A protein has these predicted regions:
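C-terminal structural segments of small proteins and small subunits
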Residues: 49-78
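N-terminal first-folded block
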Residues: 2-28, 70
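Amphipathic, hydrophobic secondary-structure cores in small proteins
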Residues: 16-60
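Generic beta-structure capping elements
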Residues: 11, 40, 74-76
């Protein structure tokens, strides 16, 4: 598992809030750093896949365990 440089707790938030919060958090990172997001919205799976494609950031990991969805996104650039 990759270590995250920043964590975002998006549990209990519904679309589009997890993506909006992730976008804000990613903007605070330097290129190459990793954001770990924990969400409970099942729709976030497709949202984060699309978010990564649109922004050029790399979705390193997408897992689901006990109703929680965990994403690791590496900021593009650098």
């Amino acid at each position: 598992m990759t270590n995250a440089d920043m964590e975002l707790d998006a549990r209990g938030l519904n679309c589009p809030l997890p993506i909006l919060r992730a976008k804000k958090s990613i903007n605070e990172l330097s290129p190459g750093q990793v954001l770990r997001i924990v969400a409970t919205d099942p729709g976030s799976v497709k949202d984060f896949e699309a978010f990564s494609k649109q922004t050029g950031n790399e979705l390193l990991e997408s897992t689901e365990e006990n109703g929680e969805f965990v994403y690791l996104i590496k900021k593009a650039g650098g």
